Design a protein with these regions (language model features):
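Flexible, active-site-proximal loop/turn residues at the rims of small-molecule/cofactor binding pockets
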Residues: 27-28, 44, 143, 154
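Short hydrophobic segments within beta-strands
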Residues: 24, 40-41, 125, 209
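Active-site-proximal cap/loop segments of hydrolase catalytic domains
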Residues: 60, 73-279
Length: 279
């Protein structure tokens, strides 16, 4: 009963640039029904997240689809260097927002193309930069995304590693003439927009996940976003995983994400206290 994932080609939000991705469907899919769609994201910009070779379960997409979802991976403008300098530099100076419009437009195009996609039930999730993007997406387009899971997200790149922000967002240089000899003093500024600034926009269901031993993206990123959501009087969910570093992937973590989408996109409440494996 195995079905091959489908390669898809769509346009970026500019209506010109071609974007490429992969779509996964339930093996027992009924094409006369409507299915929620979930996009698994990672915006780069240092690598391409879209599978380019065969594996049994690309980034967990295949197994997630079998629970009753359409699952997609798509590469966005700015996501990698392999398509040339202009493509890769699209996000320079816009590190928070550059992939968001493409992502939304991709889902809208696929819903136009395939009648089985339900645009009223759209989910998004990602890890690390993907967690950053998932949170930014549901806070930027709160009427479009109904559910988001943001794991280990670098939600405030002003406290992330400087090489990341300065490389991919850029640094502004200011000149100021000083003294009688018109000497020039230079100052540098790197201020990157954050998801924290968007917290007041939340309407859907948002799950934040972080490990308390993450030495790559410190848990402070998630705590800052959680605090902003609380200050905005928003309901959200938070999971702190004890002893976990940046690379999450335990069965508990995987099933936590599955449970969240099943309950909030499929409307199936799972009341068992035990975190059973979902196959």
């Amino acid at each position: 009963g195995w079905r091959k994932p489908e390669r898809v080609k769509v346009k970026a939000a500019d209506g010109i640039t071609d974007l490429y991705g992969v779509m996964y469907r339930p093996f027992d899919m009924d094409s006369t029904r409507k299915y929620p769609i979930i996009i698994n994201v990672y915006p780069g910009p240092q690598e391409n997240f879209v599978p380019q070779s065969f594996t049994l379960d690309d980034n967990g997409n295949e197994s997630l689809a079998q629970l009753g979802f359409i699952v997609i991976n798509v590469g966005f403008r700015g996501s990698c260097f392999t398509r040339g300098r202009n493509y890769h530099c699209f996000g320079y100076g816009n590190l928070r927002d550059y992939a968001l419009a493409d992502c939304k437009f991709v889902i809208e195009q696929l819903a136009n193309r395939y009648s089985f996609i339900d645009l009223d039930r759209v989910g998004i999730y990602g890890h690390s930069g993907g967690g950053f993007m998932a949170a930014a997406s549901i806070l930027t387009y709160p009427d479009f995304y109904k559910v988001a899971v943001a794991a280990s997200g670098n939600h405030d790149n002003n406290i992330y590693t400087k090489w990341w922000g300065e490389t991919y967002h850029g640094v502004k240089m200011h000149e100021k003439k000083v003294g009688k000899q018109d000497s020039v003093m230079y100052s540098f500024e790197s201020k990157i927009p954050t998801t924290i600034e968007l917290a007041k926009n939340l309407k859907g269901k948002l799950l934040l996940i972080t490990g308390d031993m993450d030495i790559n993206v410190h848990m402070a990123h998630t705590i800052r976003l959680a605090n902003a959501l609380m200050q905005a009087n928003k309901r959200f969910d938070l999971m702190l995983i004890p002893g976990a570093d940046h690379g999450l992937g335990s069965p508990y973590y995987v099933n936590l994400i599955r449970y969240y989408f099943i309950e909030n996109l499929l409307g199936q409440r799972l009341d068992n206290v035990d975190m059973s494996s979902i196959d």
